[in-house]
Each structure stands twice: as structure tokens, then as C-alpha cells.
Amino acid sequence: MNIKKTFTLTTLIGFYCFSFLVTKTSARIGESRTTIQKRLFSSGGAEFREESSVNNKTRGMPYAKYEEFFPKSTEIRVYHKTTDGSHSKLSGSGWELHVLYVNGVSELEIYKKSQKITEFEMIYLLNFQSSASYWKKSQESESPAEEPSAFGFDFIRDDEKVKAKKLGGNSFMVYSTELDRGFAEAMLADLKALAPQSVEGF
């Protein structure tokens, strides 16, 4: 995969819009679980299957607070991949990948690294999700009231179908705009319904 080597993330985020050279037109968000796992496992990745391990790793994740609003067909899978592509033993340094599938299709992915994610790795992660489009950096001038958002975002794809957000220095989240909006609207409706009872008696 060719990437403009003269660009660094520091340079890129200084512009409102930026694009990447891509060789694949299929994005990860929107892919089936079968496709994602085939690619991941062929690169040495493995899946956490023990329920206690999965529960421990999903606790406190951004998507966890919206669990009550998950569609019935939702599955959460957690994977581990080494940085050098060697066979994962589900421990040690490397990456954790959290994927929220709805009807067997990826709608949210969190990439969590045991060390800080480098600017070059972040470029690749965004590049993987470009789908022949390009990414725009979030602007403070954008009104958050324009559309409900559960997670907010640091980047949005030009077709507005996918958003991305940095989660500290070692994690990065990518998710569909539809899922983000759906969680936000469900939460707002729930809060609205609870408000009368909450203030009753004042």
C-alpha cells in the first residue's frame, strides 16, 4: 500500500480535509464478520472466547454505556493481534480489536494498542477505512446540535457514512454514522421519558 511519505499526521491534521492513496475500495466498517476474521486470523490474530476475559476487556469501553440500546442482532467480539504478525497467544504486546457487529456486519471497531499508536499507524488505520473517499478533521465551529451524536468525532469521512475518534494515546475508534446517531437518539428519548418522574414533587 502506497502512502505519501512526506505526510505526517501532524501535517495532515493542520488541514481541514486530507486524503490518502488507497489500493482497496472495501472499508472495514460494513464488512462481514467472516471477512474480518479471515483477514485477521491469516495475520496471526486470535479471538478471546472466555466469557470472563471478554467481559473484563469490554468493561468501560465507549460502547458499553449504550448496551441497553443494542439491536437484538448485536454481537461484540474481541481479538488480539501481535505487531509483527506472529501467532497470537492472547497475551503480551500488540493490538486488541473490539468489533461490534449488527446482523453480522461491522458497525464499530476499536483498535487498542499496548503502547502508544504512532502517527504512521493512525494514517494506516484511517486509510483502511477510506473506501475510495477521504477524511475531514472535525472543526470546533461545527455545531454539535446539527445531528445527535453518541460518541462525537475527531474525523468524518467525506461521504459522512463513517466517523473516527481518538481515545487517548493508545486507542482509536471507527464507527458508522448511522450507529452513532441511533445510540444518541435512543439515549435522548430515554432521558426525555424519565424527566417527568425525576422532577416530580419539586
Describe the residue ranges of each PLM region:
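Non-cytosolic coordination micro-motifs
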Residues: 105-202
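Short helix/turn-capping signatures at newly exposed starts of structured segments
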Residues: 2, 16-132, 198-202
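Residue-level detector of intrinsically disordered, flexible termini
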Residues: 10, 18, 26, 163, ...
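Bacterial N-terminal signal peptides that target proteins for export
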Residues: 1-11
